[in-house]
Amino acid sequence: MTLMEDAKKGIVTPSIETVAKTEGIDPETVCSCVAKGLIAIPVNNRRETLPIGIGKYMSTKINANVGTSRDYVDIDAEIKKAKAAEAFGAHAVMDLSTGGNLDEIRTRILKSVNIPVGTVPIYQAAASRKVVVEMTSDDMFNAVRKHAEQGVDFVTVHAGVNLNSLERLRQSDRIMNVVSRGGSFTLAWMLHNGEDNPFYAEFDYLLEIAKEYDMTLSLGDGMRPGCIADASDRPKFMEFITLGELVKRARAANVQTFVEGPGHVPLNEIELSVRGMKELCNGAPLYLLGPLVTDIAPGFDHITGAIGGAVAGMHGTDFLCMVTPSEHLALPTLEDIKEGLLVTKVAAHTIDLIKEGPRERAWEKDLAMAYARRDLDWEKQFELAIDGNRARKIRDARKTESDTCSMCGELCALKIVKEAFEKKNSEE
């Protein structure tokens, strides 16, 4: 049985128990939400994975993308990135490799981390042919099965890209057409072959494979906007309607899903996007890249993505895909992965401060930091900081003889007021 089947029968599995304990929520609530598809716990039955909960009442989760490109194939470097991502707090990693021995890369990444691992099988299907459009539907489904057999916990499938959404795209005024790599493969394949997307046309077969391995489907946003001018157009929302229908079919088949969301969205349209996705996709957990809130910040898109992610979290986003400083520019380095992840952790924590479920635990951290700052307890501040080592290095770089920081020294507002009160109290 799949995890969702067990949950529908009220069976609290070890994975559900682990998630409940981690999140500080009673197991029955987690079980009920898994049964309804409101929480996803991506754990392939072929792999020992640290269970994480994504969705309602869960703390905001973060994914880190790693993997080779055809220009840069260094498997050891990608393994280091995956390990670093886990060490710095990522809850999942995705192997997006397109260059080199894809089977070897994926196998090594699966062995190198304990957290859930996701992939995009169509990349391997496309790599099996000289030209992307020459891959067959068998290539696509065989890739999904291979990844499932190897223990991949969740796969992105762009099943919402179909002939209907293609027509919406043709009739639209989009500037950037399709910026999703998997979406572009699918669209090009449909145009070349004159057929509908196999992942859509044969979605029931896809569900059979996923169910056999209890593998979660991440329903990809092949029509996501690539610039803020395209943020709220018909192709995007048409895909959400389709994805919502597929979510229902997956739940009926006892296959877990979450839904991927838009890339570039201005601040004032994020609520529309996120609430629209939640409504159209029947409350499924939402997995967002960003969204990036401006197009003019290459080199700083980890920041534009964190801004968008924090706002999206106010309206229902559950799972953030971190963005690195290299976004739109190059394959990210190890340092890019660390920087992007830490910035995304800041965004995730700001979401948890207001999210039902993790809110109380998140507030405890901020309150503890407030008391540590009030008391000028630097060691406690470093302990509580998202990146305590970085905080310590900054403070140590410009030391002061006082117990304050070098910005204010003896003019520290906290110290002045504290000493003033102490003096007044001693006189009374």
Swiss-Prot record:
Chain residues that bind substrate: N65, M94, Y123, H158, S180, R181, G182, D221, G222, M223, R224, E260, Y287
GO biological process: thiamine biosynthetic process; thiamine diphosphate biosynthetic process
Pathway: Cofactor biosynthesis; thiamine diphosphate biosynthesis
Binding site for [4Fe-4S] cluster: C405, C408, C412
Gene Ontology MF terms: 4 iron, 4 sulfur cluster binding; carbon-carbon lyase activity; zinc ion binding
Family annotation (Pfam families): ThiC_Rad_SAM
Reactions listed under catalytic activity: 5-amino-1-(5-phospho-beta-D-ribosyl)imidazole + S-adenosyl-L-methionine = 4-amino-2-methyl-5-(phosphooxymethyl)pyrimidine + CO + 5'-deoxyadenosine + formate + L-methionine + 3 H(+)
Keyword annotations from UniProtKB, A to Z: 4Fe-4S, Iron, Iron-sulfur, Lyase, Metal-binding, S-adenosyl-L-methionine, Thiamine biosynthesis, Zinc
Cofactor requirements of the protein: [4Fe-4S] cluster
Function: Catalyzes the synthesis of the hydroxymethylpyrimidine phosphate (HMP-P) moiety of thiamine from aminoimidazole ribotide (AIR) in a radical S-adenosyl-L-methionine (SAM)-dependent reaction.
Membership in a protein family: Belongs to the ThiC family.
Designated name of the protein: Phosphomethylpyrimidine synthase 2
Organism of origin: Methanosarcina barkeri (strain Fusaro / DSM 804)
Lineage, broadest ranks: Archaea, Methanobacteriati, Methanobacteriota, Stenosarchaea group, Methanomicrobia
